[in-house]
Amino acid sequence: MKIIHKGLVEYLPTFEAMKTFNAGRNADTEDELWVVEHPPVFTQGLVGKPEHLLIRDDIPVVQIDRGGQITYHGPGQLVVYTMIDFKRRKTSVRNIVSALENSIIATLAEYGIEAAADPKRPGVYVGERKIASLGLRIKNGSVYHGLALNVNMDLSPFTHINPCGYAGMEMTQIADFVQPCPTPDEVAAKLTAHLETQFTPKADNNE
């Protein structure tokens, strides 16, 4: 699995690059993790309802092809796009989602933060507050899009939406629990290591 650090990049070109990568991949294409941050942007999923955008401001809204409702990305949030051929790995999308959740939970545990997945709601939570979001697109036996983990960011734009379609959803981030707060790059090093641990055995065990 190749890990590519792209830094702070605009959302729309990254979205187009994901679609191009997925459309052009073949049986020999190596899976990739893209580690990024984005300037402020709201992204609206395939089944997204306009009423979940509560306040219109100068933050752009981009309609995209992942599942789920509206969410927010901004500087200080770690985003990892998971370009994974799940058919080749002989696994399921549910297992990929679990691997993402488990990797986030293990990463947060390294900072002393007790987090958990919720079987009724996508994402990872600290108590009732959401710290990470997940969203995937399934196409041609592969997935793309991925996860967003709040590290040290301005959370106020989340109050302009119903995050992932849930009214009143309270958001949190690593900076609320850890000071000095690690940088997104420091968190990315731990998170990608956990992702490799989650995914590599699955490939090896099914060869």
Swiss-Prot record:
Key words of the record: Acyltransferase, Cytoplasm, Transferase
Major enzyme class: transferase
InterPro entries to which the protein is assigned, alphabetical: aa-tRNA-synth_II/BPL/LPL (IPR045864), BPL_LPL_catalytic (IPR004143), Octanoyltransferase (IPR000544), Octanoyltransferase_CS (IPR020605)
GO molecular function: lipoyl(octanoyl) transferase activity
Location(s) in or outside the cell: Cytoplasm
Binding site for substrate: 66-73, 133-135, 146-148
TM region positions: none
HAMAP family: LipB
Name under which the protein is recorded: Octanoyltransferase
Source organism: Neisseria meningitidis serogroup A / serotype 4A (strain DSM 15465 / Z2491)
Gene that this sequence comes from: lipB
